[in-house]
Structures are given as structure tokens and as C-alpha cells.
A protein has these predicted regions:
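Non-catalytic cap/lid and distal C-terminal segments of serine-dependent acyl enzymes
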Residues: 1-245
């Protein structure tokens, strides 16, 4: 997909349900990969393809770069993945496929860096998405200032603490109002992001924001993500079928 804002072509993997027909309009799940992965990463073992068939979803998996964290980076101007995913990609998908061209038919989720990205993009673009999810997401990046080149996207924490404070998902809950988004997230108890996910859950509870939060045994691994992505799709299916938000 050509990104005008980044002036480059971005690889995107699109899975259509087996019964796809131009006479129907389908909900779309935008599925984001993690740090060091790429647009093909979620395709492993055919799990997502089977879920697309089961729920009749179009699934869109963009390349988020090795370490973009899905920000519009103030440091590296050619990293504008928030704008790409929320605007250019959605526009492209709606023009090329028979989709529900409304927030009620769009969800966004991802794993790890992509879980952060999904929450980050959805919270800032609630007019575009009605559902947001995360598996093992980095929902608070502040404890990890030296990790995964986040500093390469935001600048060093020591120099630009305000950028880290403004762009960590856990500090963005003021953008939500009760019922404004359908929210589902989960994390394994053995995951290094477990504590920040629990903190996010506690903060949403305190602020009266309805959400589903699941904790299961497991670590930061493809075994965990491939086993549990089905619960996100189940949740999105329920939301799309209600069509209330």
C-alpha cells in the first residue's frame, strides 16, 4: 500500500473469508504485529485464516516496521505509522474490498508492540474504530526506557520525559468515556508486561470504563498468542453483531 505520509510502499497482508462475496459487506479486524516481526508474522500455522473464515471477517495485517511502536515519530519523520494505519490503510481497504465502511464494522488489535499500537491508535481515532484489543501489550512504556528502541522513536526519556508521558497508553485513558469503545485485553501471568496490563485494568476500573480483561497462565510467546487470539475475535464478533456502539 502506498503511504503518502511516509513516502514509501508498506507491505500489507489481507485475509478474506472463504465465503467472501462483493455482494456482502464485511467487518474488518486490523491486526498488528510485535517488535522485530513483520506483516506475515500473524499468518503462521493458519490460525488467523481459520478465524477469518469462522467469523466472516476481513483481516488486515500491515507491516509496522521492525520497531515503529506505531507512533508518528517526532524523531524520525518518515515513521508515521499512526497516520498510516488510522487513515491511509483504512481508506485503502475500504476502497478495495467490500467492507462495512463505518467504525461499527472496524476493530484493531495486536500483540506486544502491536497491542500498544492498537490501543494507542484506537484511543486517538475513536471515530474510525469501535473495538480495541491487545494481547500481551506494552500498555505502559515508561518502565522500559532502554528497551526495543522506543527511545529511537520518541527520543531518550531523560531528554524528553513529556513525550513518554503523553504517548504511553496508560496515560491516555482520559480520551475514553464509558461505552465510547469496546475494549478487550489480556496478558499471561509469566509475561514481562503482566504488571503494566494489571495496572491498566485497575486504572480503567477506577475511571469507570467498561472493559474485558483476561489473565491466563503463559508468557510472551507465539504459543500464547496463537492459542488466545480466538478470544479477541469472539469478542469482536459479539460487538459487531450487537451494532450498538
Amino acid at each position: 500500500v502506498r503511504s503518502r505520509c511516509m513516502d514509501k510502499d508498506v507491505p500489507v497482508n489481507v485475509i478474506l473469508p472463504q465465503e467472501y462475496s462483493d455482494t456482502m459487506q464485511y467487518p474488518v479486524v486490523y491486526l498488528l504485529h510485535g517488535y522485530s516481526d513483520k506483516y506475515t508474522s500473524w499468518s503462521r500455522e493458519g490460525v488467523v485464516g481459520r478465524l477469518a473464515d469462522m467469523y466472516n471477517f476481513v483481516v488486515v495485517m500491515p507491516d509496522g516496521g521492525y520497531d515503529s511502536w506505531y507512533f508518528d515519530s517526532p524523531v524520525v519523520k518518515e515513521y508515521r505509522y499512526e497516520t498510516f494505519v488510522s487513515q491511509e490503510l483504512v481508506s485503502y481497504v475500504d476502497s478495495c474490498y467490500s467492507t462495512i465502511k463505518d467504525r461499527k464494522g472496524r476493530a484493531i488489535t495486536g500483540l506486544s508492540m502491536g497491542g500498544h499500537g492498537a490501543f494507542y491508535i484506537a484511543m486517538k481515532h475513536q471515530d474510525t474504530f469501535s473495538c480495541m484489543g491487545s494481547l500481551s501489550g506494552g500498555l505502559d512504556i515508561r518502565p522500559f526506557t532502554k528497551k526495543w528502541n522506543i527511545a529511537g522513536r520518541l527520543g531518550a526519556y531523560e531528554q524528553y520525559p513529556e513525550r513518554w508521558e503523553e504517548n504511553t497508553v496508560i496515560n491516555m485513558t482520559h480520551l475514553l468515556t464509558p461505552g465510547s469503545m469496546n475494549i478487550v485485553f489480556e496478558c499471561g501471568t509469566g509475561d514481562f508486561f503482566y504488571k503494566v496490563n494489571c495496572n491498566m485494568h485497575d486504572k480503567l476500573l477506577k475511571e469507570g470504563i467498561p472493559h474485558d480483561y483476561y489473565v491466563r497462565p503463559g508468557g510472551h510467546s507465539w504459543t500464547y498468542w496463537l492459542r488466545n487470539i480466538k478470544y479477541q475475535f469472539m469478542y469482536f464478533s459479539d460487538c459487531f453483531n450487537k451494532k450498538t456502539k
